[in-house]
Amino acid sequence: MSLQPQAETLSFEAEVKQLLHLVAHSLYSNKEIFLRELISNSSDAADKLRYQALSDAALYENDADLKIWIDFDKDNRTITIRDNGIGMSREEVIENLGTIAKSGTRAFRELLAEKKAEDSQLIGQFGVGFYSAFIVADRVVVRTRRAGMKADQGVEWESTGEGEYTLKNIDKPTRGTEVVLHLKESEEEFLDSLRLRAIITKYSDHILLPIVMKKIKTSGADDEDKNETPEEEVVNRANALWVLPKDKIKDEEYKELYKHIAHDFEDPLAWVHNKVEGKLEYTTLLYIPARAPFDLWNREGQRGLKLYVKRIFIMDDAEHFMPMYLRFVKGIVDSNDLPLNISRELLQSNEVINKIKAGCVKRILSLLEDLAKNDKEKYASFWKAFGQVLKEGPAEDFANRDRIANLLRFASTHNDTDEQNVSLQDYISRMKPEQNKIYYIVADTYTSAKNSPLLEVFRKKDIEVLLMSDRVDEWLVAHLNEFEGKSLQSIAKGTLDLGDLEKEEKVETEKFEKDFDELLKQFKEVLGEKIKDVRITHRLTDSPTCVVFDENEMSGHLQRLLIQTGQDFMQAKPILEINPSHPLILRVKNESDKTRFNRWADLLLNQALLAEGEQLKDPASFVKGLNELLLDS
């Protein structure tokens, strides 16, 4: 006997209230999607039942003929969407209809707080789903029972979408879910068989499940003799779109299938459809979304493709077909060579899976290469949404590292913009004849990278430098050491080596070294453990000092990232480099007062650290020393 309450009134969580408001006020111009969303939910429920019934056939309850029924009642102004899928328990009803998935709650709040996203963007990211019912209905009733539970464990959910919902236990002899929409006064257009059929054909023709409606039969010659009989007929094609030849599928059909499997509100950016025949037979239909999902950076979150075996649904989120750096890809894999009862554990060590995965990766990379070459505007949209994720690729996929590297885009000193639109091929095409390295700098922000004093000699020599400021960039350059025979070189690590491009500067520096030997010793004595070394440099033209790190040590930027993530590591000390031609350095060189010299040494080091992006450990002392030097000048 259940101890659950028979009836209770509960409040939606705050995020659901916001989403309901957005749905009701932002989707009115496209209100017919409510039927697409509810049919999609029913289809998912049938897929889940099929999968769970593979290991427990009793869940079918002697009814394995899965369908979706659509009906309407003009007199009572209702539309009913009913299925015999998996159904829901009381707890699942509360979780699925009363809350946004826990993984999305925080992101939803942040987007609302920032107010950067348009309403359609919010809805696109979090999915309209069940809540779309309130576009056309002012009251929604859901009756459901989970497969395998007793008839008296049915649940009825009811809400007007304003802030609360009621739950009560009911008797429900059949498993599955029934959604009853009580339409608003202005929505009579949907109380029409032809209108509903047109929507089903437009949005849900591809649904594998039969969608059934009552058929209207007529008898006699006159309209007055028409007789309605409740005979049923299937109103969708109910076939697997992906098994059809590509030339038989319209773009709109591809788009609607994407919206169904990805639960997305927007059209996909691009897709690729492929059938492999021979020793291994499988079909893939892979999509690149137009917009990044809210949980893109959650590497532990749900991802992957829908897996079918011989057109029978097996599982959602089969992550084994795509590497982590392509986790944004949505789509379908339909294999003829896998067993129907394959488990997630078996997927991990299956040779067929590995071959299909290699094929999927190859096709997505080819699709991206085609976009990059032939549709630069669309590729720019892709890069803005998913570029940072693709940058994980060289570290994770050695076999395709060169192909991925060719798809990468960066900001650079060639363009006065933070837009990442420079490829490594572009960079190489503009290299100086004597240049043999690809130079880059990684900083906390684009502005910090662009204004770094380390760029001064490169600007003087008109040598392009890639400006990197994504958190993933340090990870990228640690695994992408060269491209087309050109090594990647950080300008923030090691000694500057421009080869033949810096002959004159090297000669000048050698002249200064003996004259500045005593000054360097004084700097080392005053700064002590704050630095690893101090030396003269020719990389500066306008700034008095800069800091760099040894070639084999972590950069300052990488160290800051590790500190932010709570990592424990041995911090590298910076190397202070001074510009022997700068007036400030010449003034300090001639400073005879030891106290003032010490202040100057601290000031010049702290200036360099600030320019590098470092946070000063004692900013108050820095300001005090600066003020004292200003008063003395």
Curated annotation (Swiss-Prot):
GO cellular component, one term: cytoplasm
Location within or outside the cell: Cytoplasm
Presence of the UniProt keyword S-adenosyl-L-methionine in the record: no
Lineage top rank: taxon: Bacteria
CDD domains: HATPase_Hsp90-like
Signal peptide: none
UniProt xrefs under NCBIfam families: PRK05218.1 (NF003555)
Pfam families: HATPase_c_3, HSP90
Annotated keywords: ATP-binding, Chaperone, Cytoplasm, Nucleotide-binding, Stress response
Organism taxonomic ancestry: Bacteria, Pseudomonadati, Pseudomonadota, Gammaproteobacteria, Legionellales
Keyword ATP-binding applies: yes
Biological source species: Coxiella burnetii (strain RSA 331 / Henzerling II)
Chain segments carrying region C: 561-633
Family: Belongs to the heat shock protein 90 family.
Record-given protein name: Chaperone protein HtpG
Positions of the UniProt region annotated as B: 345-560
Region feature (A): 1-344
Protein's job: Molecular chaperone. Has ATPase activity.
Subunit structure: Homodimer.
GO MF annotation list: ATP binding; ATP hydrolysis activity; ATP-dependent protein folding chaperone; unfolded protein binding
